[in-house]
Amino acid sequence: MAASRDADEIHKDVQNYYGNVLKTSADLQTNACVTRAKPVPSYIRESLQNVHEDVSSRYYGCGLTVPERLENCRILDLGSGSGRDCYVLSQLVGEKGHVTGIDMTEVQVEVAKTYLEHHMEKFGFQAPNVTFLHGRIEKLAEAGIQSESYDIVISNCVINLVPDKQQVLQEVYRVLKHGGELYFSDVYASLEVPEDIKSHKVLWGECLGGALYWKDLAIIAQKIGFCPPRLVTADIITVENKELEGVLGDCRFVSATFRLFKLPKTEPAERCRVVYNGGIKGHEKELIFDANFTFKEGEAVAVDEETAAVLKNSRFAPDFLFTPVDASLPAPQGRSELETKVLIRDPFKLAEDSDKMKPRHAPEGTGGCCGKRKNC
């Protein structure tokens, strides 16, 4: 069995892998960091097209971490790398919002900073609304990031690279405002990752060696104080390299996007029927909130206490009308929709179910999450 590595050694290996070994996303050995995301709205595609090619080519994320309703928000991007997602978000939050990117790899931070003036000029902003910091995502206080200072934290295939996941999530909880959200894509394992996989430098750099057992996410989130994780999308990860495939054995991996909300400590919310008013840009007809709930404009949907609390206490509150479920007519046969609805929380099940629905031959240009040019 390979000897385990300490945290400092892992950090140095990750810095070397992303700062020196990888030059473009084409150098990746697995599809862990280029898996598909959910369909991208046109306004986000347009924002992606405004990002400089040099920045996009150094992007190694595992999805597209752009949540909804971003105008005027303060957003923190953990492991911002070359700054691709930051520059997309910069356009979406607008001049009154702000985006901060933090990354431990100085080479990547310098790439992001190099193109700051270019992007602000392209977006037509009088003053920069993006800041890039060099630091560790599990030590945000050391980088000067204040408590309860952000509406949203995003992370794109990065938390798995850090040995202490709980410390990362604890710091995220600290810097989020009440009602704030961590919206993040990451890699998860089907079982506790064996030591020989954890000790493999390439597999760790490829986001597999440090992957969290998917069931542990809910345990850590509850311990810290987050609401239960809400699964959004999931895709099975494939490994084309035979040597790496042999090391992985029976351990399977999935790229998944989750939402974690930090809510104020108030009395539990009641079950409700909610009606979406269609007020969110790019999602006027329907809001796909997660794998379990899609809200169509003007249509009443029964939600559980947890979902009601999230919608009422987050930035989404103005977009919904809430009615206590008892005030509505009972569902047929005396059972409510909530009693018959089975919530999907297992990313492997969601990925497998999604694969069954996909065409056998994908259309040209849909490789990875963003097609051949990684520009969605």
Swiss-Prot record:
Q: Which reaction does it catalyse?
A: arsenic triglutathione + [thioredoxin]-dithiol + S-adenosyl-L-methionine + 2 H2O = methylarsonous acid + [thioredoxin]-disulfide + 3 glutathione + S-adenosyl-L-homocysteine + H(+); arsenic triglutathione + 2 [thioredoxin]-dithiol + 2 S-adenosyl-L-methionine + H2O = dimethylarsinous acid + 2 [thioredoxin]-disulfide + 3 glutathione + 2 S-adenosyl-L-homocysteine + 2 H(+); arsenic triglutathione + 3 [thioredoxin]-dithiol + 3 S-adenosyl-L-methionine = trimethylarsine + 3 [thioredoxin]-disulfide + 3 glutathione + 3 S-adenosyl-L-homocysteine + 3 H(+)
Compartment(s): Cytoplasm, Cytosol
The Basic and acidic residues compositionally biased stretches are 354-363
For the region Disordered, what residue ranges are annotated?
354-376
| Keywords, alphabetical | Cytoplasm, Methyltransferase, Phosphoprotein, S-adenosyl-L-methionine, Transferase
Q: Show the GO cellular component annotation of the record.
A: cytosol; mitochondrion
**PTM annotation (Phosphoserine): residues:** 47, 336
A single GO BP: methylation
Question: One GO molecular function term?
Answer: arsenite methyltransferase activity
Q: Which Pfam families match?
A: Methyltransf_31
Q: What class of enzyme is it?
A: transferase
Q: What is its EC number?
A: 2.1.1.137
Q: What does this protein do?
A: Catalyzes the transfer of a methyl group from AdoMet to trivalent arsenicals producing methylated and dimethylated arsenicals. It methylates arsenite to form methylarsonate, Me-AsO(3)H(2), which is reduced by methylarsonate reductase to methylarsonite, Me-As(OH)2. Methylarsonite is also a substrate and it is converted into the much less toxic compound dimethylarsinate (cacodylate), Me(2)As(O)-OH.
Similarity annotation: Belongs to the methyltransferase superfamily. Arsenite methyltransferase family.
Q: How is this protein named in the record?
A: Arsenite methyltransferase
Q: Which organism is it from?
A: Mus musculus
Q: Which gene encodes it?
A: As3mt
